[in-house]
């Protein structure tokens, strides 16, 4: 899983693990394009031959497995984890932590511990770290063995581990960040007192920790950067500096100090631009772009270049819209004298670095990129609630829900005639668009999740009554739609291969 910088209230978990409450509240095409997830529009992950997924009915877990549904939890679940191979289920129910081997049909749920407020697990679910109500932290295995590995943990969301579970990170009640080596009798290798506004970024194996500590000097905000590497053996401090983007997997970052922009990597810092304190950064690779009226400044680690861009206008305004995770594609809009267009700029090594116009930027709500660099955006007609979806300058869908789109292996999935604005057509029709050809799957769809091109889950006819919200669950498989269950509130799968695309203007506010 890709790491990213988080405020300490939202530290990253290391496997796909969602609150059932949160899943029920989200418009369910689950996760992505908010980068940093496990998924991509063309992942190498292969779905099991027999589709398997978890769904919830009023927070009670069920599993669909090749034509049959089975109740998995006896009671309401506050949080659950389906491992990436879809073979193990871990969940909390009324304070009890449970484990179940799904692959073993004869296996029953095993209670791991009581009075548990939160947990985290490694990718295959074989090692679990959990917090008790009194703040004690335990490490457990699926065979029932447990050991205490920490104490005085302050917040049930602030617990993370590496995949071997021999290092754990957490915050204490006095707001100290602790990184402990469980394999060495819980030896504390990082102990930093930080404020509530500080940030922590960590590599997946927890060998690199980057902390930005905020504080005040004479009522003025300030910050220092602490970098721990080599499992805490090396400590570097950059005083009076602010992180622009951290890349803990690479032990690197962009930061600003004394009004200039720097690149740091493995203990060494290089100034990349004078009199500059910000830039748009790629999520996975250390690429930074700064736009201006005459072009772009691009930094790739400590290497920089200027890219000229001229627009015949008395005044030019350039607005960054998206930079790809790998830093090779940059999307922007440029306007001058009343004209505005969407441009794509290829930043990859060896390209001619010439921006290419894609479309007029008129009534565009939001622009984003798919994993294979297609430019997706929506447009509205003035005074109309209907939205049309465009890809690389071509109209692919009219009257579509632009904040509920998925993309997988060249096909787009979206809901047409959302809210029934066109009274002559069926409402909320889930549609697949492949090479410009639309295929209607089913109407009255409220939520959906793409397992693969031949397997799509849908909740239809969603009802909202008092404390209940739910609908009928269907599976679209190999061209046929099959009813699975009723009164279903949410659906989940362990690995999402698709891009989640949100073009809703209001989601940006």
List PLM regions with ranges.
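N-terminal Lys/Arg-rich, disordered targeting/topogenic segments
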Residues: 1-11
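Sequence signature of WD/YWTD-type beta-propeller architectures
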Residues: 10-509
């Amino acid at each position: 899983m890709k790491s990213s910088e988080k405020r300490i209230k939202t530290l990253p978990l290391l496997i796909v693990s969602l609150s059932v409450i949160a899943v029920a509240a989200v418009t369910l095409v689950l996760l992505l394009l908010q980068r940093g997830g496990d998924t991509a529009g063309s992942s190498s992950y292969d779905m099991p031959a027999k589709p398997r997924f978890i769904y919830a009915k009023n927070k009670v877990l069920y599993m669909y497995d090749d034509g049959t549904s089975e109740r998995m939890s006896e009671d309401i679940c506050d949080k659950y984890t389906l491992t990436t191979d879809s073979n193990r289920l871990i969940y909390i129910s009324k304070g009890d932590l449970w484990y179940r081997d799904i692959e073993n049909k004869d296996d029953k749920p095993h209670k791991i511990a009581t009075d548990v407020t939160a947990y985290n697990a490694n990718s295959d679910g074989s090692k679990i770290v959990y917090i008790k109500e009194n703040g004690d932290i335990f490490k457990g295995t699926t065979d029932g063995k447990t050991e205490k590995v920490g104490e005085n943990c302050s917040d049930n969301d602030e617990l993370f581990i590496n995949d071997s579970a021999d290092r754990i990170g957490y915050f204490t009640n006095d707001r100290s960040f602790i990184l402990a080596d469980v394999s060495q009798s819980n030896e504390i290798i990082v102990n930093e007192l930080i404020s509530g506004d500080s940030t922590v970024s960590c590599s997946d194996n927890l060998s690199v920790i980057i902390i930005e500590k905020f504080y005040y000097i004479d009522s003025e905000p300030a910050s220092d950067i602490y970098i721990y590497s080599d499992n805490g053996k090396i400590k570097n401090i950059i005083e009076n500096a602010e992180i622009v983007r951290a890349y803990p997997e690479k032990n690197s970052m962009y930061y600003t100090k004394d009004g200039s922009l720097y690149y740091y990597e493995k203990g060494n810092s290089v100034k990349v631009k004078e009199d500059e304190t910000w830039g748009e950064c790629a999520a996975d690779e250390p690429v930074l772009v700064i736009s201006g009226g005459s072009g772009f400044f691009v930094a790739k680690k400590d290497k920089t270049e200027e890219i000229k861009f001229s627009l015949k206008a008395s005044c030019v305004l350039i607005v960054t819209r998206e930079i790809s995770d790998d830093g090779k594609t940059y999307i922007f809009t440029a306007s001058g004298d009343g004209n505005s267009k969407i441009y794509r700029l290829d930043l990859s090594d060896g390209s001619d670095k010439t921006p290419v116009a894609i479309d007029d930027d008129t009534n565009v709500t939001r622009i984003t990129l798919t994993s294979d660099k297609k430019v997706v955006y929506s447009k509205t007609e003035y005074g109309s609630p209907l939205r049309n979806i465009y890809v690389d300058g071509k109209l692919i869908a009219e009257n579509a829900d632009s904040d509920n789109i998925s993309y997988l292996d060249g096909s787009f999935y979206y809901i047409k005639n959302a809210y029934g604005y066109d009274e002559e057509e069926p409402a909320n029709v889930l549609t697949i668009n492949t090479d410009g050809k639309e295929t209607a799957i089913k109407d009255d769809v409220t939520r959906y999740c793409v397992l693969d091109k031949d397997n799509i889950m849908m909740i239809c006819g969603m009802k909202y009554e008092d404390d209940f919200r739910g609908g009928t669950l269907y599976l679209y498989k190999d061209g046929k739609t099959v009813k699975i269950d009723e009164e279903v509130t949410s659906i989940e799968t362990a690995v999402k291969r698709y891009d989640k695309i949100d073009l809703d203007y209001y989601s940006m506010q």
